[in-house]
C-alpha cells in the first residue's frame, strides 16, 4: 500500500496549459496570449512553470535568428489540472526557452511537495510552432524529471502534446489541445488529456498605458490505462478539472488570480495523488482504496501568482 501511494503520486504531473497562468498558471503545450503578453495565456492544464505554455510565436522575429526568453515567479499554490503539487503551500519556479524560427527548446524548474519527496520538478521541452491561416499550432515533447526522490521510487516520464489557438476578434480567443503519455509518472499506465479554453482581452483603449487585463477560463478531462501489476493493475480515476481567473499585466510583470476545482471525490483524490497526509474515514474500495483514505489535494483552490516574462 505504501509503495502504491508513493508511485501513484506524480500522476499530478500529466500535462497540457500556464507561469503563463505558469509562469504562473501551468507545464505544457496549451497556452496562448497576445504577442508578448504571457500573463493572458489561456491555460489548458499544463505544469506550472514551463515556458512551453503560453508562448506563441512572436510576430517580427527573424526566421533564422536564435532568440531567448526567460520567465519566473511565485504563487500561493502550485495547481496542476486541479490538483496541488505543493501541498497547498507556496511555490516558485523559473524557465528559459530558446527559439530558432519555428523550432524551440527549453528548461523549467519548480519547487514541489510530493509523496516521493523530490528536490524539484525539472521539465525539458522541445517542439515547433507554426501558424496556418489564422490558427497558431504548437506541437511539443516534454520530459518531466523529479531528482532526489525516495530510494526505490522513480516518477520521471515523457509526454507529447499539441495545441491550437485562434483569435476570434479583438477581444475573444479560443484554444484547445491534447496530451498523451505512454507511461505517466512511470506507473505503467498510459494517459490522455483533452482541454479547451476561452479568453477575453479588455481593449487597450479602455486601459492606461502599459496595462493589460485578460479574463480566461478552461476545462479539461483526464483518463488513464491500467497501472502495472506491482501497483495494483487498476486504472487511475478519470476526472474533470476547470479553472477561471483574471490576469493583470504591467509591462513584463503579471498578476494572476485564479480559481481551480475538480470533480474528484476525496477518496479518488488519494488514489490519484498518493497524498502522504491522507486521512481515514472515507468510503472503502477493496481494489483501489481498501483503507478508505481521503485527500484534499484535489479540492477547490484560489491561487494568486506573480511573475515576469522577458523576451
Regions found by a protein language model. Give the residues of each.
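Detector for outer-membrane/organellar transmembrane beta-barrel domains
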Residues: 157-237, 259-262
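Solvent-exposed loop segments that connect transmembrane elements
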Residues: 226-235, 266-294
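Transmembrane beta-strands of outer-membrane beta-barrel proteins
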Residues: 68-72, 94, 103-107, 124, ...
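Short loop/turn motifs that connect adjacent beta-strands in outer-membrane beta-barrel proteins
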Residues: 57-67, 116, 131-136, 152, ...
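Outer-membrane beta-barrel biogenesis signature
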Residues: 22-70, 80-83
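Outer-membrane beta-barrel "beta-signal"
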Residues: 200, 248-253, 279-285, 294-311
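Residues that define the transmembrane beta-barrel architecture of outer-membrane proteins
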Residues: 64-66, 88-92, 118-122, 135, ...
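Transmembrane beta-strands of outer-membrane beta-barrel pores
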Residues: 74-80, 100-102, 109-113, 130, ...
Amino acid at each position: 500500500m505504501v509503495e502504491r501511494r508513493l508511485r501513484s503520486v506524480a500522476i499530478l504531473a500529466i500535462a497540457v496549459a500556464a507561469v503563463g497562468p505558469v509562469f504562473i498558471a501551468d507545464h505544457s503545450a496549451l497556452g496562448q496570449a497576445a504577442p508578448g503578453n504571457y500573463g493572458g495565456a489561456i491555460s489548458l492544464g499544463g505544469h506550472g512553470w514551463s515556458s512551453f505554455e503560453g508562448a506563441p510565436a512572436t510576430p517580427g522575429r527573424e526566421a533564422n535568428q536564435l532568440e531567448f526568453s526567460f520567465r519566473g515567479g511565485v504563487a500561493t499554490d502550485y495547481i496542476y489540472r486541479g490538483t496541488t503539487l505543493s501541498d497547498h503551500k507556496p511555490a516558485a519556479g523559473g524557465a528559459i526557452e530558446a527559439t530558432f524560427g519555428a523550432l524551440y527548446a527549453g528548461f523549467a524548474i519548480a519547487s514541489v511537495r510530493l509523496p516521493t519527496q523530490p528536490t524539484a520538478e525539472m521539465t525539458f521541452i522541445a517542439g515547433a510552432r507554426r501558424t496556418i491561416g489564422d490558427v497558431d499550432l504548437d506541437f511539443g515533447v516534454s520530459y518531466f524529471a523529479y531528482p532526489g526522490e525516495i530510494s526505490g521510487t522513480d516518477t520521471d516520464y515523457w509526454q507529447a502534446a499539441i495545441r491550437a489557438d485562434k483569435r476570434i476578434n479583438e477581444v475573444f480567443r479560443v484554444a484547445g489541445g491534447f496530451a498523451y503519455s505512454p507511461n505517466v509518472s512511470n506507473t505503467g499506465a498510459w494517459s490522455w488529456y483533452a482541454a479547451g479554453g476561452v479568453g477575453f482581452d479588455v481593449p487597450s483603449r479602455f486601459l492606461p498605458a502599459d496595462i493589460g487585463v485578460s479574463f480566461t477560463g478552461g476545462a479539461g478531462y483526464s483518463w488513464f490505462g491500467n497501472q502495472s501489476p506491482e501497483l495494483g493493475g487498476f486504472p487511475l480515476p478519470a476526472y474533470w478539472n476547470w479553472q477561471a481567473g483574471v490576469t493583470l499585466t504591467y509591462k513584463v510583470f503579471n498578476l494572476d488570480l485564479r480559481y481551480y476545482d475538480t470533480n474528484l471525490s476525496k477518496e479518488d483524490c488519494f488514489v490519484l495523488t498518493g497524498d502522504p497526509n491522507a486521512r481515514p474515514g472515507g468510503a472503502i474500495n477493496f481494489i483501489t482504496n481498501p483503507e478508505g483514505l481521503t485527500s484534499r489535494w484535489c479540492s477547490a483552490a484560489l491561487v494568486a501568482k506573480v511573475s515576469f516574462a522577458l523576451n
